[in-house]
Amino acid sequence: SYGMEQIKGKLLPMLVEVLRADGQTISGVYERNDVELREKEGLEQYKGWFPLPGEEPPASALTEIVENGVRYAVDVENGQKTGFFLDQKYNRQAVARLAQGRTVLDCFTHTGSFALNAALGGARHVTAVDVSETAVAMARENARRNGLEGVMDFRAADVFDLLPELAAQP
């Protein structure tokens, strides 16, 4: 937004300072200001590394995060929206608690976050589906990072086409 644009030059370095003081490793701040709303506010659309004083930007926008003990590769440059939906943290925790001994279907899996939490929560088997081959590849990589390849199955398919097929299975 226009208001945030005016203060980000001061705010982002302070955010990095606070996170580093908390023991977080911060190598850069990647901005995703590539939404049409910015143009309505007279701002240009762009995405890229915010320059931090004395720092070279990372070579890649692919990063690893850990949430609830689960490791994720996240593409902040090209991933859907911000690359990871942070607001779903507690829903992913709930899935982990509910998955014990169950067979789970994760539709629209994206990074595989719900599927991974189900598998780590003790699901017997998890199938993760997304229409995007790129998303499925990222979800598969995240399963590998967490040692879950044997519990999970991945499919690149349109969920609405796949559901009738799955429903017909015994």
Where are these regions (language model features)?
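A short interface-forming secondary-structure element
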Residues: 1-6
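Non-catalytic substrate-recognition/targeting regions of SAM-dependent transferases
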Residues: 9-84
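Rossmann-like S-adenosyl-L-methionine
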Residues: 55-170
